[in-house]
Amino acid sequence: MKFTATFLMMFIFVLMVEPGECGWGSIFKHGRHAAKHIGHAAVNHYLGEQQDLDKRAVDEDPNVIVFE
């Protein structure tokens, strides 16, 4: 019961604090900035793998017959 009451009080406190107080705005701004970089890194990593797979699919096409 104590844990629940403490959790609720902390939750209410966090909701009531304005973004300008205690540097919350700065923390949220840096968090958004970090999330944006992580998202871009994930997309770039996925696209790099996709290009490798596309290249491999063209190089290893089983329908192409090559006589050497």
From Swiss-Prot:
Its main location: secreted. It comes from Pseudopleuronectes americanus. Keywords: Antibiotic, Antimicrobial, Secreted, Signal. It comes from the Eukaryota. Pfam families: Antimicrobial12. Residues 48-68 form a propeptide. InterPro entries: Antimicrobial12. Residues 1-22 form the signal peptide. It is found in: Secreted. The gene is ple4. GO terms for biological process: defense response to bacterium. The keyword Acetylation does not apply. This is Pleurocidin-like peptide WF4. Belongs to the pleurocidin family. Antimicrobial peptide. The keyword RNA-binding does not apply. One of its GO terms (cellular component) is extracellular region.
